């Protein structure tokens, strides 16, 4: 038992020392934690530790990130490298965004209040911007300036991909409305909807936010651009420090 605890602590310390972007972390740390610790613990003891949740039927785990007070990561229990994986474009593979959206309740618990949907965000970074070779969706509050931009230009977002009116966190994004995350694979929506995306998914980043209109969602897609110094980090649209969101209904 002591060896098992020390392994988990070592892995988590490895993640905690890298901060945003996790540069320099063991690229297999997340997979090791979920595959070797969380899933076996859930199966043997009905205890997902060190994860907060392991949903065996759903095929995912949720782990508290050591960066930020409220940030959680949804991680498939199936080994999937990241946004570039062809598996995510297979009709038989789920995209995990609906599961991540339901897991926002953990963010709300840490925030001490229910959060308006348009203040909650889900982000998948590009291959360039990540250091973990296991797909993970960042779940946290949206940055206040990004929320303001999305609210101000909500009417410009339609049912097909189009460039968003202004840069978000200094980077260009395309946006599209989604009515229900249970009815769409957001990775496939990106690959099929933006020219060239299918061929270079590794450079793409995806963010999903509750719609400012109060119904449905907004998906945002960016891409790494070395010339512009853009790594394709959708996580940059999130606020891991201070959640400015009011309580839901206020």
Question: Which sequence ranges carry the predicted segments?
Answer:
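Positively charged n-region of N-terminal signal peptides that target proteins for export
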Residues: 1-5
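Bacterial N-terminal signal peptides
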Residues: 6-17
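HIT superfamily nucleotide-processing domains
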Residues: 21-250
């Amino acid at each position: 038992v002591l060896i098992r605890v020390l392994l988990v602590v070592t892995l988590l310390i490895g993640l905690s020392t890298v901060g945003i972007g996790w540069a320099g972390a063991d690229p297999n740390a997340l997979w090791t934690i979920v595959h070797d610790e969380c899933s076996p613990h859930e199966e043997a003891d009905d205890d997902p530790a060190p994860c907060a949740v392991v949903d065996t039927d759903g095929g995912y785990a949720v782990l508290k990130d050591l960066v930020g007070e409220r940030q959680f990561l949804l991680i498939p229990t199936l080994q999937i490298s990241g946004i570039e994986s062809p598996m995510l474009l297979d009709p038989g593979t789920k995209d995990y965004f609906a599961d991540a959206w339901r897991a926002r309740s953990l963010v709300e618990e840490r925030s001490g209040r229910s959060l308006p949907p348009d203040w909650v965000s889900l982000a998948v970074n590009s291959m360039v911007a990540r250091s973990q070779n296991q797909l993970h969706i960042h779940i946290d509050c949206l940055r206040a300036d990004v929320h303001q931009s999305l609210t101000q230009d909500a009417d410009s977002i339609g049912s097909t991909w189009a460039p968003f009116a202004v840069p978000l966190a200094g980077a260009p994004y395309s946006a599209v409305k989604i009515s229900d995350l249970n009815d769409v694979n957001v990775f496939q929506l990106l690959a099929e909807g933006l020219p060239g995306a299918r061929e270079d998914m590794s450079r793409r980043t995806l963010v999903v936010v509750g719609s400012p209109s109060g119904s449905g969602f907004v998906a945002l897609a960016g891409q790494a651009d070395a010339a512009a110094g853009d790594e394709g980090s959708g996580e940059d649209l999130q606020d891991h420090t201070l959640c400015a969101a009011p309580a839901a209904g206020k």
